[in-house]
Amino acid sequence: MKASTVLQIAYLVSQESKCCSWKVGAVIEKNGRIISTGYNGSPAGGVNCDNYAAIEGWLLNKPKHTIIQGHKPECVSFGTSDRFVLAKEHRSAHSEWSSKNEIHAELNAILFAARNGSSIEGATMYVTLSPCPDCAKAIAQSGIKKLVYCETYDKNKPGWDDILRNAGIEVFNVPKLNWENISEFCGE
């Protein structure tokens, strides 16, 4: 399977997320086959982020105007639903809630593979957002040998990529607009 196809599948998987801030998707591919997927969200049976945010009043109606580059909007929109966005002033409260209640896409994909008895040794992980340091440590320990990501999380602590590279994992950043030319970035 072409890397550009797998990356697009990761984006589609991200749309299953109920997070009102970031919708993140991860796909683990090995020998040309998808063996696991994951998206960020609450554990099964837990309260979903979008529902909790609505109850807490963290959401705004999505503005109908186009945001001009460099303009600071009143809200942040990172793949949220078509109608609502997380209000900027509630981003830190959301982050605190999310860190206690949501599992990241990368870890969900790794756990799904483990739960189903699929070896990810030597696999490639495609993810729509750069991993946090905790996910980078999990990826480093998992046996994955290559990570391909699109966007860089703006609040990420530095060094997550060093964790991966120090574990011998190749790391590639592929901007969304270059998905068709992904072979230029990661040789697939």
Curated annotation (Swiss-Prot):
Reaction equation(s) it catalyzes: dCMP + H2O + H(+) = dUMP + NH4(+)
SUPFAM superfamilies to which the protein is assigned, alphabetical: Cytidine deaminase-like
Record-listed E.C. numbers: 3.5.4.12
Binding, Zn(2+) 1: C19, C49, H94
Keywords: Allosteric enzyme, Hydrolase, Metal-binding, Nucleotide biosynthesis, Zinc
Cofactor(s) listed: Zn(2+)
One of the GO biological process terms: pyrimidine nucleotide metabolic process
Pfam families in the cross-refs: dCMP_cyt_deam_1 (PF00383)
Cofactor note (record): Binds 2 Zn(2+) ions per subunit.
CMP/dCMP-type deaminase domain location: 1-171
Active-site feature positions: E106 (proton donor)
GO molecular function per UniProt: dCMP deaminase activity; zinc ion binding
Function comment: Supplies the nucleotide substrate for thymidylate synthetase.
Quaternary structure and interacting proteins, as annotated: Homohexamer.
Homology family: Belongs to the cytidine and deoxycytidylate deaminase family.
Protein name: Deoxycytidylate deaminase
The encoding gene: CD
